[in-house]
Amino acid sequence: DSTSRCLAFLPLAHAYGCAFDFLTAFCCGSHTTYLGKVPSPKILMKALSEVKPTVIFTVPLIIEKIYRKQIQPMLEKKSMRFMLNVPLLDTTILATINKKLTETFGDEFKEVIIGGAALNPEAEEFFKKIGFRFTVGYGMTECAPLISHSFWHEFKLHSVGKVLPTMEAKILSNDPQNEVGEIIVRGENVMLGYYKNE
């Protein structure tokens, strides 16, 4: 809606960035700020604190970098490992980390939507444990680009949400018990084919 704010920093030449940082924001009347620079951590954090987006579309690389460079070193300290094993103190520490992380992303977002690649399971588990408002979606360019998504409060660990109501999906495998299958989807947003590729 017109009260929502978006900070666009994904490449608009890619389906994910084009669909959500541009088209969805445009169609919803969202106020969109385009970063216009390569999103280094410093530039991105400054922009997030100024824009205070209400929804954030990002890729795993950015979330994982924050986890690896800022959170993980703190968690690996001997004193922190000890404190995280003390009942009540652990929940206070995790709540504080969530609060600071939420502030880092501008403090006003409804959820951070991660897509474009798989999220590191360790980072995903940690963010879920602290109650960070994030979700992981799945899609591909050929599906304009979304296939599945769940809102953060419904999101299950190591999943990519529920298949969209306008789509059908199934996994094909000759031997489902022993062989990884292929995900196939059908729906109004799936392209018919490639240009001049009869």
Predicted regions and their residues:
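Conserved AMP-binding/adenylation subdomain of ANL enzymes
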Residues: 1-5, 12-100
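Short, well-ordered beta-strand segments
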Residues: 5-8, 184
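Short, flexible loop/turn elements at secondary-structure junctions
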Residues: 10-16, 39, 118, 141, ...
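Conserved AMP-binding/adenylate-forming
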Residues: 56, 93-198
